[in-house]
Structures are given as structure tokens and as C-alpha cells.
Curated annotation (Swiss-Prot):
It comes from the Bacteria. Its EC number is 1.8.5.-. Heterodimer of a catalytic subunit (MsrP) and a heme-binding subunit (MsrQ). The lineage of its organism: Bacteria, Pseudomonadati, Pseudomonadota, Alphaproteobacteria, Acetobacterales. Belongs to the MsrP family. This is Protein-methionine-sulfoxide reductase catalytic subunit MsrP. One of its GO terms (biological process) is protein repair.
Length: 312
């Protein structure tokens, strides 16, 4: 495997470092005063910079937490923040089953106290042609999958979210056309890639409800809809699993969903992206989209010999 080189975010993606450090200092002070707990809106995580973290800081916290796609809480970008307040992310259990020798049942509250939590500052590219840079805190998915000891016949990983219509009003909206629960999938080698993260927090705090609490998938070289939120079950399979958006519109949303500026969505271009949180004298800032979202050196070999226009 090639030596990892962290992709350097573009200047337009980055906010001043002192703003982020100031925020982390305030968070630490709150923890020292005992101001947060495991069930508070945002609890401090004991995290450390991971091997794939950069020294630059992300999109403003307000944008990251108030511009979201999470259809379980509604179709609008502001709906997740306003409609998720009654959602209870704890207690929570994560199951890893299927083609494994050692099925795993994890108490997420224990995961939140894990010393293995790393900070990873990643680009996030939405299929809707907008982007952010987000400081995730989480555990490499490969770490948990290895604990389950995958069977040699396993080729894919299926992810399933939770169904709680009483707490997730979007699950009662027939207009969405979505068959709940939300489901996603990866090839096993994609899931085991060092970049793939099971995120438990952002900005050094537990995930807000609107960002996928208590845990979500982060695959930075793929479009954001692959990042399934509020994961309840993970299963290892010997075949490609169905996925929500591919099932809804297979001509628009492929199974792989790798960021590719040369393959347009049928209804819009993917060549450029609108940078959330960045402004200029001429309005919203746009920048060129990078192949594999800038992570090609780390993941391109996964797709060697494949037709990426066909396998989009």
C-alpha cells in the first residue's frame, strides 16, 4: 500500500485555525466544570489527532450543524436541526453480524469513552454539488470489523439505520418515497480502507442529532449519501446489498457513488461544487471538484480496471 499523504484542503475550504482552537479550549473548560454528560446535547470526547488528520480547520460549526440532509427528519436543509430535538440517541446498541466468526454487540456509550477515537479532518462532497470540510471524531471501521473476524466468503458490508417514526417525523412523510429503514453498503475492501470511519462526533463533541447521532459512516471519497446515519446494524454479506438511493433512482445514484467530476448527475454537472460557509464579493464560492474528492492516491487502486462511468 502506498504511503498515506493527507490531501491538503484548498484555501477556500478552511476557516482560521485560531477560531477552532478557541472553540476546543472552551469545550475543554466546560468538561472540567462537569458541564456535559453522556446524554447532554453535546458531550466532550477524549480524542486525539489520527494519522490521517491535517493541521487545518473546517467549515464553521454553525454551517456543519444547520445545513444537512437527513430525510428521517424532513426534506429541507434546516429540518434536521429543528425536527430532531426529541430524538434519543442513547442508550444505543450496534450489532455486527452476518458472515463473521465473532458477532459483535456494542454498547455505544462504551464506544464514546474509547481511547481509540481519532480526529479526522475530511472533505465532504454532497451529490448535490456542494461541499464542506468537517472535523470528524471516530474509530476506523476496520477496527470494529476485524473484531468481528470476517468470514473468508464475505465480500460486502450492509448498513441499516433505525426506524422511529415517533421521533423521526420524516419517516411518516409518504412524499419522500423512501422505504425505511435507510440502508447503505460498501464492498468489504472499501469498508476496510484506512480512510473509512465510524464517526461518533464532530469538533471534539458527540454527534448532534441532526448530524447522525449517535454514530454514522464517513467515506470521504464518496458522495455524502453513502454516509448512513444513526446506524443500528452492520452485516457482512457475500453479495452486493441494496441501497436506499440506488433502489429509488438507479440511473441517478449508483452503488459506488465515488466522487467523479467527469460523470455528471443526469440533472446537473459534477465538475464544480459550491463551498458551504465560504463567501466572496460575487456570492457563493465555487471550486473544481477533485477526482475521488482528493483522495485518489489512497483509494484509486480499489477501482483499477473498472469503468467508472458504468460503475458510478
Amino acid at each position: 500500500m502506498a504511503l498515506f499523504r493527507y490531501p491538503r484542503p484548498l484555501p477556500s475550504e478552511i476557516t482560521p485555525r485560531d477560531m477552532y482552537l478557541s472553540r476546543r479550549s472552551l469545550i475543554g473548560g466546560a468538561a472540567a466544570l462537569g458541564a456535559v454528560s453522556a446524554t447532554a446535547d453535546a458531550a466532550t470526547l477524549q480524542t486525539h489527532p489520527g494519522p490521517y488528520s491535517g493541521n487545518l480547520t473546517p467549515t464553521p460549526h454553525e454551517d456543519v450543524t444547520h445545513y444537512n440532509n437527513f430525510y428521517e427528519f424532513g426534506m429541507g436543509k434546516a429540518d434536521p436541526a429543528t425536527q430532531s430535538q426529541t430524538f434519543h440517541p442513547l442508550p444505543w446498541t450496534l450489532e455486527i453480524t452476518g458472515l463473521v466468526r465473532k458477532p459483535v454487540r456494542l454498547d455505544v456509550e462504551q464506544l464514546l469513552r474509547s481511547p481509540a477515537i481519532e480526529e479526522r479532518i475530511y472533505r465532504m462532497r454532497c451529490v448535490e454539488a456542494w461541499s464542506m470540510v468537517i472535523p470528524w471524531d471516530g474509530i476506523p471501521l476496520a477496527t470494529l470489523l476485524k473484531d468481528a473476524d470476517p468470514d473468508p466468503h464475505a465480500t460486502h458490508v450492509a448498513f441499516e439505520s433505525i426506524v422511529r417514526p415517533a421521533e423521526m417525523p420524516g419517516q411518516t412523510e409518504a412524499l419522500s418515497g423512501i422505504q425505511w429503514p435507510y440502508v447503505e453498503g460498501l464492498r468489504l475492501d472499501e469498508a476496510m480502507n484506512p480512510l473509512t470511519l465510524l464517526a461518533l462526533g464532530i469538533y471534539g463533541e458527540t454527534l448532534p442529532n441532526q448530524n447522525g447521532a449517535p454514530l454514522r459512516l464517513v467515506v470521504p471519497w464518496k458522495y455524502g449519501f453513502k454516509g448512513i446515519k444513526s446506524i443500528q446494524r452492520i452485516r457482512l454479506l457475500d453479495h452486493e446489498p441494496p441501497t436506499t438511493w440506488n433502489r429509488l433512482a438507479p440511473d441517478e445514484y449508483g452503488f459506488y457513488a465515488n466522487v467523479n467530476p467527469q460523470v455528471d448527475h443526469p440533472r446537473w454537472s459534477q465538475a464544480t461544487e459550491r463551498v458551504i460557509g465560504a463567501r466572496s464579493l460575487f456570492g457563493a464560492t465555487r471550486q473544481p471538484t477533485l477526482m475521488f474528492n482528493g483522495y485518489g492516491e489512497q483509494v484509486a487502486d480499489l477501482y483499477r480496471g473498472m469503468d467508472l462511468r458504468k460503475n458510478f
